Amino acid sequence: MAKSIYLIGGSKGGVGKSLVTMATVDYLQERGESVLLIESDTSNPDVWKAYKESTETELINLDEADGWIQLVNLCDSKPDSVVVINAAARNNKGVSAYGETLNSTLAELKRKLVTLWVINRQRDSLELLKEYMDAIPNADVHVVRNGHFGEEKKFELYNGSKLRTAVEERGGQSVTFPDMADRVSDDIYSKRMSISVALKELPIGNRAELTRWRNEAKKVLEGVIHE
């Protein structure tokens, strides 16, 4: 088998996809994996800006058929790289229209597609997840409750939903991602830093918080990332 594809989705802006993507890239690189990062948020490519110096990175528009073709060809040309896709906020239309391009080639690529679907506590990120699962039925899907929006029990809409049952019956997990102090996340975004660079360059208190968050994120990712 070639290495897996990890798609970090959510289809809404502001649910925390970028930070989950950064944590995923950081976790894989710490384990010695070669990573190919695909940034599909071409209007606000914050993960690309933070990682383009240290990681092989491509900007691809997945709202168009050409982007999906380019994505599949890249996945085929780099079988030894784990592919991490940061999906754009508006991406469900592109997935619904063209996702079959990737879905139908997974067997030939010899890759698993694993989706980390980041949610807040609102209904629309759940509705968008159902659309995504219908569009790419071959994907393994794990739901990531972003702890920035509250502790696990506050995600009542998802926790009690039929969608959660459907995700878990398909073998998916429901996990809760740690919150990062705003001061540190603001630094990472405004200074366009990767996590590893931030751990060297931020002030000592900020680095202590980032280390705490990184260790908590690692515990979550260990349960859903298997290379």
Curated annotation (Swiss-Prot):
The entry's keywords: Plasmid
Protein origin, superkingdom: Bacteria
Gene3D superfamilies: P-loop containing nucleotide triphosphate hydrolases
Name of the protein this chain belongs to: Protein MobD
The species this protein was found in: Acidithiobacillus ferrooxidans
Source taxonomy: Bacteria, Pseudomonadati, Pseudomonadota, Acidithiobacillia, Acidithiobacillales
Name of the gene this protein is made from: mobD
